[in-house]
Curated annotation (Swiss-Prot):
Reaction(s) the record says it catalyses: tRNA(Glu) + L-glutamate + ATP = L-glutamyl-tRNA(Glu) + AMP + diphosphate
Cross-referenced SUPFAM superfamilies: An anticodon-binding domain of class I aminoacyl-tRNA synthetases (SSF48163), Nucleotidylyl transferase (SSF52374)
Source species: Staphylococcus epidermidis (strain ATCC 35984 / DSM 28319 / BCRC 17069 / CCUG 31568 / BM 3577 / RP62A)
UniProt name for this protein: Glutamate--tRNA ligase
Keyword Aminoacyl-tRNA synthetase: yes
Positions of short motif 'HIGH' region: 11-21
Enzyme Commission number, as recorded: 6.1.1.17
The entry's keywords: Aminoacyl-tRNA synthetase, ATP-binding, Cytoplasm, Ligase, Nucleotide-binding, Protein biosynthesis
Amino acid sequence: MSERIRVRYAPSPTGYLHIGNARTALFNYLFAKHYNGDFVVRIEDTDSKRNLEDGESSQFDNLKWLGLDWDESVDKDKGFGPYRQSERAEIYNPLIQQLLEEDKAYKCYMTEEELEAEREAQIARGEMPRYGGQHAHLTEEQRQQYEAEGRKPSIRFRVPKDQTYTFNDMVKGEISFESDNIGDWVIVKKDGVPTYNFAVAVDDHYMQISDVIRGDDHVSNTPKQLMIYEAFGWEAPRFGHMSLIVNEERKKLSKRDGQILQFIEQYRDLGYLPEALFNFITLLGWSPEGEEEIFSKEEFIKIFDEKRLSKSPAMFDRQKLAWVNNQYMKTKDTETVFELALPHLIKANLIPENPSEKDREWGRKLIALYQKEMSYAGEIVPLSEMFFHEMPELGKDEQEVLQGEQVPELMNHLYGKLESLESFEATEIKKMIKEVQKETGIKGKQLFMPIRVAVTGQMHGPELPNTIEVLGKDKVLSRLKNLV
């Protein structure tokens, strides 16, 4: 592309960074970086009543954690600020006045009750609710009368009649809207605060945003924004609307969906890796060429192609997320995974709050046992239950394993060998098991399966010598003694 690419992610601090917004930020970031452009983070904070105290800081913190480095924002002003809408009144106000003077906007004094009554009547008649234009041509005398009554006006944009607004969506193709289906809409609320569709169009123009990539739910906002560009004689940016994210039942992903965690913070807390979430979310509604699914951030930037954004809804597959994160977990060094897992082990009272070096060394060995199968760091707690709790009650299959005629001899032999081991380490335990095999003649499954069931209560698990080492001599001997 010949022009400089400038895109924006514009969150509201009324909430925290969730999967949908993270995807919006991510696709904008990849698009900008692919074309050596600018990724701008703008804060849309005009809804002061709903803004959360830590809403803004949480957005930035989680974007940074995901690896999205912005080029411009409240902390990096490159001459296009302010980057908070609440600080841009000096930009909005003259433009609003201009629209009023050019009769492209007007003051509307209708009350909320009057507007609601109109809306209900339209619905009752089977009509699409829209403002009927009752105050579109008030006389000066009527305006003064409403002012005298203490009514505060909103300001509405005067929608042109019989006009078609068309744009070529980079995802959906050509989309058109008829202006006659859109009532005169509010650009300034009664409290004097500009509405979303006015402010966002002004901000995108003054910040020289070249491309607007956002969720499917913003398609209906586009004609209103195009009206603002037209009213001021500005060139509109290109638009692209990403497909919905749906759950495994093909229903729109909702914050009320109890099956899927919605917020990036929740995945951080569970011990997911940021690069894994980056990878997984990028594949929600976009696909690379070929079959490969694991890419680094740098690789994604290189191969990102907006033409491969999908029109079809993207399914949030929890098993796929677990698989992707597991691929990254396997490549990490044990120390990194241990540090991620440590808070979970402490919270479950499995490791002391202030672990000694001996505790930490034991924890590293525990992680090494399960690292290849862990989907996230916090999963170490349910995976490693056998190390912290009493032997579980054996199931039918496990009981059958221990009923083999060779088992009593095997257990007695094993107990004696383990008891006499001076160095209770995996390498020595492995040698000792080979000695038991040689001395008893028991081998294969008939050797290993009874030992595993006897010391862990399970038929499957990590490497047996390593498992025995991590369980510790006292616990293993106690379990064998109870069995014998």
